[in-house]
Design a protein with these regions (language model features):
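N-terminal Sec-pathway targeting helices
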Residues: 2-23
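C-terminal region of N-terminal signal peptides and the immediate post-cleavage residues
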Residues: 6-8, 26-58
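A short, Trp-centered hydrophobic/proline-enriched beta-strand micro-motif
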Residues: 57-82, 107-111
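Short, hydrophobic/aromatic-rich segments at coil-to-beta transitions
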Residues: 64-68, 105-110, 184-191, 215-218, ...
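Short, solvent-exposed recognition patches
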Residues: 75-96, 266-386, 393-401
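An acidic-aromatic
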Residues: 98-158, 228-232, 379
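Gly/Pro-enriched, hydrophobic low-complexity segments
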Residues: 112, 175-259
Length: 407
């Protein structure tokens, strides 16, 4: 594994972790092409907690449906996304990605994706999986990851939703706007925004929710002072009802090469080892007793943020957090060349694109790879046998200043 590859992967994973608050809560599209209801009656008035409860129940057990979807992003650079792609997986989201999706149940799914790097088709029917790569004219097929035998999940309760809202309340404001029409359907509009606008580059996140099925129809994340979303997921058409069974019977295209399905083409979450999640400890001194390298604290954190958390990762890495909520800055470190925040399943194939990331001089002969995006930035570097990753929803210049303070 090369130093640059490890640094870039660690940077990418940490940056995604920090920015994930916005993308995961994610949350709905630009209002272009939408209109408030005039002729139609507005949907039932719901409180925030009741609407969130219905969304959680609907996404946990969705009805059969077919939909046309478009995803766009201008957050991460194309070479990083292409480098982090996986063989047999979906095309990297370096440009608009259009997809047609048919869902017949937990083990019946068909997705046809159109991207700049060629079309892909993914089909699951029972335990059988097919993945077609139009650019290579290859089909990978085999038994997919089996359904896990787990007890039924507890239903979403008002208490659970209220607990979530209580956790969000100190740093975030959740509100509803006037209902709109999207994809010919009535939709609720939820808006999540940071209370401390100066602590983050994220302006707001929005979600449009279908008033009939309570499935999300659009998501978007907006950066500060930018009118267009930097990440958006949009459903342009949605048909709810039974899906023809023959859509889940994959027909191999003429001349296509058929190859065995590799487990690497399945979701990487299946590969995560036990203990992969960070474990919080009380102090830096306690963490220092458990690792074999010197833990560094930021002498000049961005925006004078205070140390708010100390975490052990995979037994040989440490993650320090500064600040809270949307403005959290993460400082990960561990023995090796930039692998402090890198999950063990990442492979060497990512190196080529990662080497193209820009570098900045931190002084003392140390250079860092840098990602700068509209909603956050990240640095990754190595010094004296220790890899470091610094990331947060702050300008890159603030991270550079904090990193130089370590010299």
């Amino acid at each position: 594994m090369t130093s640059n590859a490890g640094e870039g992967r660690g940077l990418a994973r940490s940056l995604v972790l920090v920015l994930g608050i916005a993308v995961l809560l994610g949350l709905a599209g630009a209002l272009v092409g939408m209109r408030a209801f005039a002729a139609q009656a507005p949907p039932e008035e719901l409180s925030n907690d009741e609407l969130l409860s219905r969304v959680a129940r609907a996404t946990g057990d969705p009805p059969a449906f077919s939909a046309s979807i478009t995803v766009e992003q201008s957050v991460l650079p194309a070479q990083l996304l292409e480098a982090s792609g996986q063989e047999g997986g979906p095309p990297a989201l370096s440009g608009p990605l259009s997809a047609r999706v048919w869902y017949g149940g937990p083990t019946q799914l068909r997705a046809e994706l159109q991207g700049e790097n060629g079309d892909r088709i993914f089909v699951r029917n029972g335990s059988r999986v097919w993945i077609y790569d139009g650019a290579e004219n290859t089909v990978r097929t085999g038994e997919g990851v089996p359904e896990q035998e787990t007890p039924d999940e507890e239903p979403v309760t008002p208490t659970g939703v209220n607990r979530l809202l209580d956790e969000l309340a100190p740093t975030s404001e959740l509100s509803q706007q006037e209902p709109v029409e999207v994809a010919g359907r009535q939709a609720y509009v939820l808006v999540l925004s940071p209370r401390d606008e100066g602590a983050t580059l994220v302006d707001r996140a929005q979600m449009l929710v279908d008033s009939e099925t309570y499935l999300p129809l659009r998501f978007a994340v907006y950066a500060d002072e930018r009118p267009d979303p930097v990440f958006s997921y949009q459903v342009s058409s949605l048909d709810v009802g039974p899906v023809p069974a023959d859509l889940f019977d994959f027909q191999t295209p003429p001349g296509a090469e058929v190859l065995p399905l590799e487990q690497g083409a399945e979701p990487r979450e299946q590969e995560r080892p036990e203990g992969a999640e960070p474990t919080q400890v009380e102090t830096v001194a306690e963490a220092q007793r458990l690792v074999d390298f010197r833990i560094r604290e930021l002498p000049d954190p961005p925006g004078d943020r205070e140390l708010t958390g100390v975490y052990l990762k995979n037994g040989d890495g440490v993650v320090l957090t500064y600040g809270s909520g949307w403005g959290t800055v993460v400082f990960a470190q561990g023995q090796g060349d930039g692998d402090a925040a890198m999950p063990p399943e990442a492979g060497d194939a990512e190196a080529n694109g990662l080497q193209q990331l820009p570098t900045v001089d931190l002084g003392g002969g140390v250079e860092a790879q840098e990602i700068s995006t509209p909603i956050g930035s990240g640095l990754s570097w190595s010094a004296d046998g220790v890899g470091y990753v610094l990331a947060g929803s702050v300008p890159a210049s603030e991270l550079e200043q904090a990193a130089r303070g370590l010299r």
